[in-house]
Amino acid sequence: MDRLGSARARLVMCTALVLIAAACGSDDKASTATTATTTAAADTTATPATTATAATTAAPAANGTGTTSPDSGLQHETFTTADGTVIDYVMVVPPDREVGKEGKVVFAFPPGGQDLDTTENVVNGRWRDEALKRGWVVVSPAAPESGLYYSDKSAKYVPELLDAIAKQYPPEGGKFDLGGVSNGGLSAFKAALDYPERFRSLVVFPGYSQDGGDDPNLSKLKDIGVAMFVGGEDTGWRQASELTEKTLKDLGYKVELHVVEGSGHIIESLTGADLFDAMERVRA
């Protein structure tokens, strides 16, 4: 990468971290989980971000309208559900990805209020470059007017959107991978627990079940590999994550927990490479 490209990558990452921090600051799901009985090993290393060539062509959305930004590699799409609810979402599609051909697709929930600007900024800062490098499609939905995706009123639309995406870019083996940060991590756990047959992995940074780390419904994740990242200073979320890890390990399921010591709710050292590496390790 030349010096200009390196500077651009650093600027994108720094800008994204500021915007993620602002978004996560509005999260209203503080943890009250029971203190865990185990502590995971710290993971304080991170791979430098990689800048990849942006996608310049893409198929049109399954319904509605879409726009593509060649400079950023991002597509803005609109999906209308059966009941008329409009969902805006952001996509990253590698330039060599063929429409109708199976491949890896990650469905990633944004943090905070899950508005479109936040959604775009997180995709741009955490998912885009590594997805283009590795050939992954990324789909990240902004919340509809019905509310955030950890609520039943909005979570019910997830299967419809997955079906629409699958018509264009079928996920490998018929199952999507799943990601989320903060409120998006809560949303990702809800989607995995509500529709476990649709997913093969779950990566959150951070996230857990709203019913706690000892939620009996975690048994539904038998066929979903789970990787969690949490800041060592993010006390409530760390406790919930540690208890989630213990519950899943006791069930004999595939799970990783990376506690990044010295970090708070926003894990600044975490890169797209870290996220995709974890996803590829745990995916079923």
List the model feature ranges, each with a label.
Residues D96-E102, Y149-N183:
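Gly/Ser-rich "nucleophile elbow"/oxyanion-hole loop immediately N-terminal to the catalytic nucleophile
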Residues G185-P196:
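Short glycine-enriched nucleophile-adjacent loop
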Residues V90, V105-F109, V137-A142, K175-G180, ...:
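Structural recognition of the beta-strand scaffold that forms the well-ordered cores
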Residues S201, P206-E280:
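The feature captures the conserved acid-bearing segment of alpha/beta-hydrolase catalytic domains
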Residues G25-S26, T32-T37, A42, P48-V105, ...:
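A domain-start/cap signature at the N-terminus of enzymes
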Residues R97-G103, A108-L148, G236:
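Short substrate-entry loop that stabilizes the transition state in hydrolases
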Residues I20-A23:
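C-terminal motif of bacterial Sec signal peptides marking the signal peptidase cleavage site
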Residues M1-V12:
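Bacterial N-terminal signal peptides that target proteins for export
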